[in-house]
């Protein structure tokens, strides 16, 4: 299920367009996640009181978390599936501390693709989208495997 060199080139090529503005991309991903899947917001005590779109948009914590999420994802993507060292601590914290279900990873990965497509329509064509979806599926599957190692079946 691995990606070809060409697919990784697509993934890393678009990621190079995302990286200069991780904050805006990350903020949009988190806001969209909470809007489309409100149950995900309930996992974050610090975001529970942000009940309007304006509150989410003006929250420095939402911006910070979005940046953190995309920074971690970028480090993992750049490893081109040799991401054990990056993935293990992320999976451990999400499985044992935060208890984030794998389904939520699926939600956020779908949203990441949509946000990139909206922000970079001319650079994120069908081949790049397919490659990114494949890379994110690989990430989710590897996270799910690690979850099992940590005894979390989420």
Curated annotation (Swiss-Prot):
GO terms for molecular function: heme binding; metal ion binding; nitrite reductase activity; oxygen binding; oxygen carrier activity; peroxidase activity. GO terms for cellular component: extracellular exosome; sarcoplasm. GO terms for biological process: removal of superoxide radicals. It catalyses: Fe(III)-heme b-[protein] + nitric oxide + H2O = Fe(II)-heme b-[protein] + nitrite + 2 H(+); H2O2 + AH2 = A + 2 H2O. It is found in: Cytoplasm, Sarcoplasm. InterPro entries: Globin, Globin-like_sf, Myoglobin. Residues 2-148 form the Globin domain. Its EC number is 1.7.-.-, 1.11.1.-. Its main location: cytoplasm. The keyword Cytoplasm applies. Keywords: Cytoplasm, Heme, Iron, Metal-binding, Muscle protein, Oxidoreductase, Oxygen transport, Transport. Heme b binds at residue 94. Nitrite binds at residue 65. Gene3D superfamilies: 6.10.140.2100, 6.10.140.2110. Monomeric heme protein which primary function is to store oxygen and facilitate its diffusion within muscle tissues. Reversibly binds oxygen through a pentacoordinated heme iron and enables its timely and efficient release as needed during periods of heightened demand. Depending on the oxidative conditions of tissues and cells, and in addition to its ability to bind oxygen, it also has a nitrite reductase activity whereby it regulates the production of bioactive nitric oxide. Belongs to the globin family. This is Myoglobin. It comes from Chelonia mydas (Green sea-turtle). The lineage of its organism: Eukaryota, Metazoa, Chordata, Craniata, Vertebrata.
